[in-house]
Amino acid sequence: MAKQIQAIRGMNDILPTQSPLWQKVEAVLRSSVSAYGYSEIRTPIVENTDLFKRSIGEVTDIVEKEMYTFADNNGDSLTLRPEGTASTVRAGNENGLLYNQEQRLWYMGPMFRHERPQKGRYRQFNQFGVEVYGIGTADIDAEVLMLSARLWEKLGISDHVSLELNTLGDPAERAVYRDALIAFLEQHKDALDEDSKRRMYSNPLRVLDSKDQNVQAILAGAPELMDFLGEESKTHFSQLRELLDAVGIKYTINPRLVRGLDYYNRTVFEWVTSSLGSQGTVLAGGRYDGLVAQLGGKDTPAVGFAMGLERIVLLLETLELNKDIPSEVDVYVTAMGDSCLVEAIKIAQELRSALPNLKVMSHCGGGNVKKQMKRADKSGASVALLIGEDELAEGMVTVKHLRNDIEQQRVARSALGAFLAELAIK
């Protein structure tokens, strides 16, 4: 026997038993962004490597360690996209969507990062994101946070997530703070871990996000960015908080929240959960007003967020909120003998036409009644339709209930659609 080929480490299959939960999550995401009037954008999986170096930042973990980069046959450096925002900006600039325009966009698709696979974190993962361009005021920051809160409500996990909020100010304010932070870190350099020492000069704000407990103890005395903000940044953040208070969205201000990508300014936020252990962040985002110009467009304010679907699915499974997923099959149609096969197939087609939301599976492959009923039960269907010679002669169909103790019934073929609709099989 030939050796089986396995999936690449950290790149997982989503199997038929898992797909219904994924479909539920995706349906909630689509309906939620639709309710806010957002439009879908789809971008290529492969982009020029420079796109991510210029947007994410050359001294970030993603660019330094995690990107899947390769040279094509022309010698061009290409990269599997590690996140969705840079591609969305590139597409907007290239296709004239952003200049002097407002755009509310969303995307969903696979991303790739070569990091150590662990629960809820994979090398290929599915990301959903929202991006808004052309609006620089705090009300749109509030809107994307309201939208994110709506997702949790519709998924039934509002009580299991909490919002952390911060502001990074504008680039000039952050530059002054950066110098102050470096000066502070230099006083404690010998006590820092190696990762923080490496970042101290190249990307000092990322030291604030260190997971090392000793570093966090040192940072308790560090200067806070909030003290370096100008009036405009303070007003923006104050207006955002007022709007969130007005609509009842609770939050905690986290002065250590800086996000892992270089392009953020002013508002940054994360929705976190305590139900997934160390992988606590389930959605993150913020404002990135300089990114469009950084990638060749005009100065354009922008704000958005992204979430990994694997973590949302894992959270739903952890909280055991995946139990009410409907079966992929509502009705299983059987033929009691070869002479009944054609009519059984026709009945299945009639039901699909009359009741478009009904999920109808036809038995194929023959077999006796016992075999067909075993397949019907395994399919997860609520009822099986038995079509034999007696039923055909009388214009009837036998309905066998598979999930409760109701006795099987004979129903006129002409009334079958109405009967199944009355059973509330949807």
From Swiss-Prot:
CDD domains in alphabetical order: HisRS-like_core, HisRS_anticodon
Principal location: cytoplasm
One GO CC term, this protein: cytoplasm
EC numbers, comma separated: 6.1.1.21
One GO process term, biological-process aspect: histidyl-tRNA aminoacylation
Catalyzed reactions: tRNA(His) + L-histidine + ATP = L-histidyl-tRNA(His) + AMP + diphosphate + H(+)
Enzyme class per UniProt: ligase
Keywords for this protein: Aminoacyl-tRNA synthetase, ATP-binding, Cytoplasm, Ligase, Nucleotide-binding, Protein biosynthesis
MF-aspect GO terms: ATP binding; histidine-tRNA ligase activity
Disulfide linkage: none
Record's subcellular location: Cytoplasm
Family statement drawn from the similarity comment of this UniProt entry: Belongs to the class-II aminoacyl-tRNA synthetase family.
PANTHER family referenced in this protein's UniProt entry, alphabetically: HISTIDINE--TRNA LIGASE, MITOCHONDRIAL-RELATED (PTHR43707:SF1), HISTIDYL-TRNA SYNTHETASE (PTHR43707)
NCBIfam families the UniProt entry points to: hisS
Assembly, per entry: Homodimer.
Protein name, entry field: Histidine--tRNA ligase
Organism: Shewanella baltica (strain OS155 / ATCC BAA-1091)
